């Protein structure tokens, strides 16, 4: 989130700077400086602005390039984080504090093993938050050699969007796929299920979808089988 987005959100509500400053508990002068980029927006302020101005979770701050994976995700409750971002499969967990969906998606894709229900929610993140910071996401996915996993998630998201007749969303996702295509890795991987047996791996090499084969992933996940595909 930057000053331009802050100003756009204020104008969207037809508020003057004085009205917004009162709601955000800052002075009008300080709000003006933030909108002009002369003062930084703290995380605490951004979280308040999200609620007051009804901004999407994509406005939440992202970690620096160096710190994107600095904190271990092994204790992350990804089901709760998906629920907090509105994923219907975990709607009963929506009370959790939200994080930027690009950060949640990246950290989940970097996990060696995920609950299958969580893995199924990752294409939903890409589809629902199609306007997330893709430059940040793709850069960091490439740093950790996770671009194939990301490409597969985006491929399923595009497939589901097309099935829902969401042409503009599908178009955006296809444009991101083109970027990921240029960075596609030749080595075999799984879609966050590294603990599968050799027998399972052999079976999946023969029975995976064309999309999974294209991204060199061993998985039986298909867009048509996702619970939200027909919503």
Q: What kind of feature is each model-predicted range?
A:
Residues 167-231:
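Charge-dense, extended regions
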Residues 24-40, 62-65:
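Recognition helix of helix-turn-helix/homeodomain-like DNA-binding domains
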Residues 144-175:
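Small-residue-rich helix-loop
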Residues 17-18, 28, 39, 57:
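The DNA-contacting recognition helix of HTH DNA-binding domains
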Residues 4-23:
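Short basic helix-loop element that most often maps to the first helix and adjoining turn
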Residues 67-131:
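Helix-turn-helix/homeodomain-like alpha-helical modules used for DNA recognition
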Residues 44-59:
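DNA major-groove recognition helix of helix-turn-helix/homeodomain DNA-binding modules
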């Amino acid at each position: 989130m930057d000053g331009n987005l802050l100003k756009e959100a204020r104008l969207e509500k037809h508020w003057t700077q004085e009205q917004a400053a009162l709601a955000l508990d800052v002075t009008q002068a300080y709000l003006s400086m933030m909108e002009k980029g002369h003062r930084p927006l703290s995380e605490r302020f951004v979280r308040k602005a999200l609620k007051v101005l009804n901004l999407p979770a994509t406005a939440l701050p992202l970690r620096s390039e160096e710190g994107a994976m600095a904190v271990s995700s092994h204790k992350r409750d990804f089901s709760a984080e998906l629920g907090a971002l509105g994923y219907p499969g975990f709607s009963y967990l929506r009370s959790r504090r939200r994080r930027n969906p690009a950060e949640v998606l990246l950290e989940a894709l970097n996990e060696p093993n995920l609950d299958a229900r969580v893995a199924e929610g990752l294409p939903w993140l890409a589809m629902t938050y199609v306007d997330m910071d893709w430059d940040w996401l793709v850069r960091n996915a490439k740093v950790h050699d996770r671009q194939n996993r990301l490409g597969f998630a985006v491929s399923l998201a595009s497939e589901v969007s097309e099935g829902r007749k969401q042409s503009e969303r599908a178009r955006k996702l296809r444009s991101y796929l083109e970027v990921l295509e240029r960075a596609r890795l030749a080595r075999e991987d799984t879609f966050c299920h590294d603990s599968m047996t050799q027998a399972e791996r052999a079976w999946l090499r023969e029975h995976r979808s064309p999309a999974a084969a294209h991204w060199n992933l061993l998985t039986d996940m298909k867009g048509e089988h996702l619970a939200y595909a027909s919503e």
